[in-house]
């Protein structure tokens, strides 16, 4: 009887460990905005995502040209400096997981000013990429949150 109980306990622990170690979703691909971004110039109409066991690389193209940001999949901080109009903006990036949602945080420092953009990525049942982004209102108001839907292109 004791062996059965120990065996059952080992089985339960193994199942729980297996569920915890499930693979995270892959966001790799070319994506095109399918929801109306409104007047928010910070939402890119297209983006390319490359994801492997070490890095997530997001390349967006929009009003401000091409922008590439890399994130370390292990959760450590990374650097993604941005050259803009002859100036360098220092950017620190970090990736974290909240269940099957990926949380991307990018902090930018420029001219003594610092601001943070946080994005929560998830995949819908139909394979669409859902992004909820929160950034500062650069007009002096509180944070601005936008929700965007992308389809693979």
Question: Model-predicted segments: where are they?
Answer:
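Bacterial N-terminal signal peptides that target proteins for export
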Residues: 1-10
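Hydrophobic h-region of N-terminal signal peptides that target proteins for export
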Residues: 12-21
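Hydrophobic small-molecule pocket/channel-lining residues, especially in calycin-type beta-barrels
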Residues: 22-153
């Amino acid at each position: 009887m004791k062996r059965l109980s120990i065996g059952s306990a080992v089985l339960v622990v193994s199942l729980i460990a297996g569920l915890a170690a499930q693979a995270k979703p892959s966001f790799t691909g070319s994506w095109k905005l399918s929801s109306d971004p409104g007047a928010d110039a910070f939402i890119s109409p297209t983006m390319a995502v490359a994801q492997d066991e070490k890095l997530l690389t997001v390349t967006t193209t929009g009003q401000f040209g091409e922008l590439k940001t890399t994130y370390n999949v292990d959760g450590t901080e990374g650097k993604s400096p941005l050259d803009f109009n002859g100036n360098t903006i220092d950017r620190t990036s970090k990736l974290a997981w909240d269940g099957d949602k990926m949380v991307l945080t990018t902090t930018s420092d420029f001219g003594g000013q610092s601001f943070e953009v946080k994005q929560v990525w998830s995949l819908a049942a139909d394979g669409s990429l859902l992004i909820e982004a929160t950034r500062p209102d650069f007009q002096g108001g509180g944070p601005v949150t936008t929700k965007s839907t992308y389809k693979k292109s």
